[in-house]
Amino acid sequence: MTDPLFDVTDRVVLVTGGSRGLGAAMCTALAQRGARVVVASRKLAACEELAARITAAGGQAHPLACHVGDWESLEGVVEAAVAVWGRLDGLVNNAGMSPVAPSLLETTETLFDKIVGVNLKGPTRLTALAATAMARTGGGSIVNVSSVASVRPTPLTTTYSAAKAGLNALTAATAMEYANVGVRVNGIVCGVFDTDATAGFVGDPELLASVVRPVALQRVGRPDEIVGAVLYLLSDASTYTTGSLMTVDGGRG
């Protein structure tokens, strides 16, 4: 039985990047606890597959195609999410991309725009649209999925680190902007998790060793280990929490 404090029963939550990795873990866990989940990502087929699995297990899920980097299409995304169950109670800005560039000089404008578009521009627009929709039904909660790269940047991920640092600033600013309409905005600063996006180095013993060396727990995270933070921030357990960044990284000094 779900603790009433962390109850998300019947809450409508839109999760971007929801069809795989951390997003899929979030969608599955939220649905298991009674939330009505909108699984959104660029590949509709992948969203449909996860939504079908959630539904078969007794949960409620709806697939939705969503290109977070496409500013003009995002209004339609929020409208579509609201249309499914008549409201929107939660948004998880989880979609992201973190390609490694050889150097800042060799980072093309196209790559720069893609990284900033998915990691900052899209969440900015979605936050504004979702907060407006939430305000119409009494408020809600927005969770921005950031990265340790935003506070511990490395040379090979300069643009990604800068975009995620911008996302942290967006979290603080919008928490202030939307507090008066009952919308809370918080962030999760994630360490490295074992997902398809990190398979390239998690599967390489030498690279993996270098990644976990500064981590207190000496390992990468499992996708299900993000669930507790998300449940806290989307539920009434966090009604006095806004503008905060919660670090989930296995402990880094």
Q: Where do the PLM segments sit?
A:
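Conserved glycine-rich cofactor-binding loop
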Residues: S19-R20
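The beta1-alpha1 cofactor-binding region of Rossmann-like NAD(H)/NADP(H)-dependent oxidoreductases
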Residues: L44, A65-V77, E109
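Substrate-binding pocket helix/loop in short-chain dehydrogenase/reductase
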Residues: P102-L104, T108-V116, L207, V211
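Active-site helix of classical SDR
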Residues: T127, A163, T171
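Alpha-helical segment proximal to the catalytic Tyr-Lys
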Residues: T132, M176-N180, T239
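Residue(s) in the substrate-gating loop at a strand-loop-helix junction
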Residues: S147
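C-terminal substrate-recognition "lid" of short-chain dehydrogenase/reductases
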Residues: R219-V248
